[in-house]
Amino acid sequence: MAEQVTSARATAKTVRIAARKVRLVVDLIRGKSVAEALAILKFTPRGASPVVEKVLLSAVANAENNFDLDREDLVVSEAFVNEGPTLKRFRPRAKGSASPINKRTSHITITVTEK
């Protein structure tokens, strides 16, 4: 007997924003309904908001297309951010020296579940 799937997931990997900054946005939508989460993301003035919104819409699309779940019944059940690979660069400094610049990336994962 086939088990009824009630959740869908979407992931964005190696996004060029530090995980610490993305977590500030992701913490706002965890546990909210999809409609409420999209409204919050639309009016949150942070650089990570459009990226998180895109991942959320992808998770909703996965739920609708792959598992025939209804958009109005979906809730953001799980949302987390992990650190991705760090791009290491160097900035020239005085007297011929250089200092390291770490360009941090992150992996964003959002899971939506039916109420």
Swiss-Prot record:
<dbReference type="GO" id="GO:0006412">
    <property type="term" value="P:translation"/>
</dbReference>
<keyword id="KW-0687">Ribonucleoprotein</keyword>
<dbReference type="InterPro" id="IPR036394">
    <property type="entry name" value="Ribosomal_uL22_sf"/>
</dbReference>
<comment type="function">
    <text>This protein binds specifically to 23S rRNA; its binding is stimulated by other ribosomal proteins, e.g. L4, L17, and L20. It is important during the early stages of 50S assembly. It makes multiple contacts with different domains of the 23S rRNA in the assembled 50S subunit and ribosome.</text>
</comment>
<dbReference type="InterPro" id="IPR047867">
    <property type="entry name" value="Ribosomal_uL22_bac/org-type"/>
</dbReference>
<keyword id="KW-0699">rRNA-binding</keyword>
<dbReference type="GO" id="GO:0019843">
    <property type="term" value="F:rRNA binding"/>
</dbReference>
<dbReference type="InterPro" id="IPR018260">
    <property type="entry name" value="Ribosomal_uL22_CS"/>
</dbReference>
<protein>
    <recommendedName>
        <fullName>Large ribosomal subunit protein uL22</fullName>
    </recommendedName>
</protein>
<dbReference type="InterPro" id="IPR001063">
    <property type="entry name" value="Ribosomal_uL22"/>
</dbReference>
<comment type="function">
    <text>The globular domain of the protein is located near the polypeptide exit tunnel on the outside of the subunit, while an extended beta-hairpin is found that lines the wall of the exit tunnel in the center of the 70S ribosome.</text>
</comment>
<keyword id="KW-0689">Ribosomal protein</keyword>
<dbReference type="InterPro" id="IPR005727">
    <property type="entry name" value="Ribosomal_uL22_bac/chlpt-type"/>
</dbReference>
<dbReference type="Pfam" id="PF00237">
    <property type="entry name" value="Ribosomal_L22"/>
</dbReference>
<dbReference type="GO" id="GO:0003735">
    <property type="term" value="F:structural constituent of ribosome"/>
</dbReference>
<comment type="similarity">
    <text>Belongs to the universal ribosomal protein uL22 family.</text>
</comment>
<comment type="subunit">
    <text>Part of the 50S ribosomal subunit.</text>
</comment>
<dbReference type="GO" id="GO:0022625">
    <property type="term" value="C:cytosolic large ribosomal subunit"/>
</dbReference>
<keyword id="KW-0694">RNA-binding</keyword>
